[in-house]
């Protein structure tokens, strides 16, 4: 029997999703270590330069998540309906289309790199480092997209542990290459070295996953003659729209964070939000990893119309994420100084600003965990419209309104409160939508 077809209790669900959670936490940890290398060996301003380019990174990530989550939902549903041949055909088509999109996007970044760097607001201090990092993003952006595909598709193929192992290898490679490329005593490549290290490390799961689906034909999923049903790609993109919208929203709001905090605290403000976003990436990885792990199970149960298991999986998930989010909030507040010290010295002019910002923003996690799961739920149920509505509401509409109103009303603390209030409004909307569709999907 397909591993997705068995009945899941809390222990079984945790066993299946834990490799994905650990994989995402490790990948985020390696990203944080990457930032620590840059801050220590290149400088705090170089770290701020990376944050200037983060919106482009988020756009590339949005493409990867759109294809991976939307495509995996379709593959999971087809497997649940015992349409394994169609699932294999769609898998092949998904890879081809993703490759074409990556090539086009990389060309655009490399051709217009100077204009993009200026557009993102890099001043004379940050411009050169920001440009150098953007070029590496353009060269290696495709690896991020295919790493997203690898993470989701290996879970759908019933191989989450393989994804976890690849995550460990990729991360360790990133750390080693960071030291070799960035260290003044070795290659001394500066901020470009960080970009090359990340790109090469991301290539490991991307290439390995591709080879797995080429040669491992004993499993349900492997590359087959590509489907000619291009409509399925549009359905996958539509279904993964919430992830696309979510990351595009992060790109927009990160740009707004940079502009507003530069107004209040110049480059110290950009340094502070950079540190906070690095730490938040690690904490949010727990929620993201769980959602990636549970998504194929939800899609499969929905495909086979197993409503009792669908209800059980959703109920367990909501309780688990609520408990984890509370733990994350407590850790963030109690150890805010220690977390900030991973990047900044205590005597840094941006230190106290980062500590206060982290302590306030962390309150949003209880609402964020619920919002992310409900949005992921509707993606898994192949309802991209509702999923996108929830994503764009919480991460763009509510966030932009809060970023405009709160800093104007109460100053710089309004910047830190904006995510908390935006996620709260998003939670109210998610709860309403979740209950409205309860009887449509019988969960």
Where do the protein language model's features map onto the residues?
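N-terminal transmembrane alpha-helices
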Residues: 5-42, 55-70, 74, 99-106, ...
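Short alpha-helical transmembrane segments in multi-pass integral membrane proteins
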Residues: 1-17, 75-142, 186-241, 298-364, ...
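Helix-terminus/linker motif at the lipid-water interface of multi-pass membrane proteins
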Residues: 29-48, 117-124, 180-189, 251-278, ...
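Transmembrane alpha-helix boundary and packing residues in multipass membrane permease domains
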Residues: 20, 24, 36, 73, ...
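Short runs within selected transmembrane alpha-helices of multi-pass transporters and secretion channels
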Residues: 68, 137-155, 163-171, 194-209, ...
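Hydrophobic transmembrane alpha-helices of multi-pass small-molecule transporters
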Residues: 59-62, 174-178, 206-210, 282-285, ...
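Transmembrane helical elements of multi-pass membrane transporters/channels
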Residues: 15-34, 136, 170, 201-205, ...
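Small-residue-rich hydrophobic transmembrane alpha-helices
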Residues: 47-107, 144-163, 272-330, 334, ...
